[in-house]
Regions:
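Signature of the 12-TM Major Facilitator Superfamily
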Residues: 22, 96, 114, 135-139, ...
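Juxtamembrane and boundary regions of transmembrane helices in multi-pass small-molecule transporters
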Residues: 158-189
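Alpha-helical transmembrane segments of multipass membrane proteins
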Residues: 9-14, 28-32, 102-103, 145, ...
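Hydrophobic mid-bilayer segments of alpha-helices in multi-pass membrane transport proteins
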Residues: 1-10, 17-36, 57-64, 178-187
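Residues that define the loop-to-transmembrane-helix transition and helix capping
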Residues: 20, 91-92, 134, 168
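Transmembrane helix boundary and interhelical junction motifs in multipass membrane proteins
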Residues: 18-24, 75, 107-119, 149-156
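Membrane-embedded alpha-helical segments and adjacent helix-loop junctions characteristic
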Residues: 33, 37-129
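Transmembrane helix-bundle signature of multi-pass membrane transporters/permeases
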Residues: 98, 102-103, 137-146, 174-179
């Protein structure tokens, strides 16, 4: 069995097949050779039972909401309001980045979407205010991580579905730490 495994794996890698695809093909080949259970039926059952969960319907809606906020200009107006609210703080624009990331995280549910949206909106402010680009982008990257913690979080939904944990309890468990983390980010700036 080991000889067949290594031969198939090395053959796929020699053909310049990507490692992930090679391991997937290797798993299929080995399951057909050595397993009595049909793997294709098991894959179909797992995919169907996972996608048939009504809680996962929320994920595309969070993505759509984030896109609506960006395309409609609401994210830009939110960021502009935050820029006007915190200029009295030292590093006011950095605090605007973190606060905007926290507010957008509360609507999008995704760290990547939060960092990308606020980064897109905020990039024009670097030249206007003369901040260090490293520090400016660092606050956006740090604030973007709030998207996974501040509810509603896509990762919390997926975790709750997979572990059969109450999603409202996960949301309650993430809210206070998210606010504390945003406050600590602002304190660090």
């Amino acid at each position: 069995m080991l000889a067949v495994t290594l031969t198939v794996l090395l053959g796929l890698l020699a053909l310049a097949v990507p490692v992930a695809a090679g391991l997937g093909v290797l798993g299929l080949v080995l399951s057909e050779l050595y397993s009595k259970l049909p793997l294709t039926l098991a894959i179909g059952e797992i995919a169907w039972s996972t996608s048939n969960n009504f809680l996962l319907v929320a994920i595309p809606f969070f993505v759509m909401l984030g896109e609506i906020l960006l395309r409609s200009g609401i994210a830009e107006r939110m960021y502009g309001a935050l820029v006007l609210w915190v200029p009295w703080l030292p590093g006011g624009l950095m605090h605007s980045n973190i606060a905007a990331c926290a507010m957008f995280a509360a609507t999008s549910g995704s760290s990547v979407a939060t960092a990308a949206t606020i980064g897109t909106v905020a990039m024009g402010e670097i030249e206007k205010h003369g901040y260090s680009e490293r520090l400016f982008l660092g606050t956006i990257a740090a604030g973007g991580t709030l998207g996974i913690l501040i509810p509603p979080s896509i990762n919390m939904i997926v975790y709750g579905v997979l572990t059969e944990t109450s999603i409202p309890q996960l949301y309650l468990a993430g809210f206070i730490p998210g606010i504390i983390l945003a406050s600590l980010f602002s304190l660090t700036v």
